[in-house]
């Protein structure tokens, strides 16, 4: 079905709004993936706070123009599925990576984070970013570990002083 000019403008505006509020973006090719599997992917994306849409490449180029995702223009060939992470930078990459493991025909093309282009082979960098809660937990563990080490060193120093005095 052909899109009218107004429909195209609406799509560009909608995707541009999503891009402006997004933390990262991932582009993929979903040729050969069944509708049922795509429906499950869309549902999972909504639950993860990821905006996902199949968009014509020319419209997508216009939508990301002037945003930090303009670096993706070179990979916009063939059928394009784009996902913008709104809540966590690695959400879309993690979602696509897990989906690609289960579906051989699903191909991740590239990603972008903070205006930096991320090739498909390096998408793990983005997918393995810790969530906010995970980062806080790691920080707390490091702080707790440091204070426990300090306590052990202090007790050892007191012991050494007592042994030297005796």
Swiss-Prot record:
InterPro entries from the entry? Ribosomal_uL10, Ribosomal_uL10-like_sf, Ribosomal_uL10_bac, Ribosomal_uL10_bac_type, Ribosomal_uL10_CS_bac
Q: Name one GO molecular function term.
A: large ribosomal subunit rRNA binding
Q: Which UniProt keywords apply?
A: Ribonucleoprotein, Ribosomal protein, RNA-binding, rRNA-binding
Asked whether the UniProt record includes Signal among its keywords, one would answer: no
Q: Give the GO biological process terms.
A: translation
- Which Gene3D superfamilies does its entry note? 3.30.70.1730, 6.10.250.2350
Pfam families to which the protein is assigned, alphabetical: Ribosomal_L10
Q: Name one GO cellular component term.
A: large ribosomal subunit
Which stretches are annotated as coiled coil? none
What is its biological role? Forms part of the ribosomal stalk, playing a central role in the interaction of the ribosome with GTP-bound translation factors.
Similarity section: Belongs to the universal ribosomal protein uL10 family.
Q: How does it assemble?
A: Part of the ribosomal stalk of the 50S ribosomal subunit. The N-terminus interacts with L11 and the large rRNA to form the base of the stalk. The C-terminus forms an elongated spine to which L12 dimers bind in a sequential fashion forming a multimeric L10(L12)X complex.
UniProt-recorded name of the protein: Large ribosomal subunit protein uL10
């Amino acid at each position: 079905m052909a899109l009218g000019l107004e429909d195209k403008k609406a799509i560009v505006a909608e995707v541009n709004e999503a891009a402006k509020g997004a933390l990262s973006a991932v582009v993929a090719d979903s040729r050969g993936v069944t509708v049922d599997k795509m429906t499950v992917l869309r549902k999972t994306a909504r639950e993860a706070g990821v905006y996902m849409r199949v968009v014509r490449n020319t419209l997508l180029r216009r939508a990301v123009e002037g945003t930090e995702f303009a670096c993706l223009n070179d990979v916009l060939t063939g059928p394009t599925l784009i996902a913008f992470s709104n809540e966590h930078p690695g959400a879309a990459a993690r979602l696509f990576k897990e989906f690609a493991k289960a579906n051989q025909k699903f191909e991740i093309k590239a990603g972008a984070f903070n205006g930096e282009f991320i090739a498909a082979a390096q998408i793990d960098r983005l997918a393995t970013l810790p969530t906010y809660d995970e980062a806080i937990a790691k920080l707390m563990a490091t702080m707790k570990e440091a204070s426990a080490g300090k306590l052990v060193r202090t007790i050892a120093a007191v012991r050494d002083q007592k042994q030297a005095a005796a």
